[in-house]
Amino acid sequence: VSKEHEKIKVESFGIKFYENLEKTIDQIIEETYSYKIPISINLSEEIYNYFDMFAMLSNKDLSKAIKTEFEMYCGDQGYNPNVFETRYVISQNPQDKQKLKVIHIAANKIELTKKTQALEKNKLTSIVPVSMAITNLIETKPKENYLIVNIEDTTTVTTILDENVYHVDTFED
């Protein structure tokens, strides 16, 4: 890994199978002398929800509406919404220009804390859903559509429409 101006260049990468995440990351850091390099790991067991919102809502009202939709989902599932860390991505709905499509992602706060604590001696800077981060591996073009398939224990199919993540499908083995 090297830095040229404001860009970070990854000169090599690979796949490592592991039983213990902490030991594996320590080994990779040692092998690559990457002691000062920020680390990003994949989120696991995240929950995806999709909401359609009226496009004319203000940002404040949109945020409240998304929160309300998630709380309703949690109520239906018997979940406490306070145990989740949530983020969302908003894109245009190509089928209905009056609506926005919201991809809402929720992860258990306790599991996030466990991962953060396990890697606290390293330079962990982010925990990201692989389905969203994987889009950074390709250069998208306007008006082009893409499907990215990531095959692991859980297979994810990320649909990109016109440079925006539109949908994420997950399939268990």
Positions of predicted regions on the chain:
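Small-residue (GG/TT-enriched) beta-loop-alpha framework at ligand/catalytic clefts
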Residues: 1-2, 12, 95-173
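Internal amphipathic helical hairpin motif
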Residues: 43-102
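Hydrophobic side chains in well-ordered alpha-helices
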Residues: 24, 28, 114-115
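N-terminal basic/disordered segments at the start of proteins
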Residues: 1-19, 27-31
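Short glycine-rich phosphate-binding loop at a beta-alpha junction
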Residues: 32-47, 125-128
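A short alpha->loop->secondary-structure connector
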Residues: 7-10, 56-62, 120-125
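Short amphipathic alpha-helical segments
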Residues: 17-24, 58-62, 66, 111
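Phosphate/pyrophosphate-binding loops at sites that engage ATP/ADP/AMP, CoA/4′-phosphopantetheine
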Residues: 27-38, 74-79
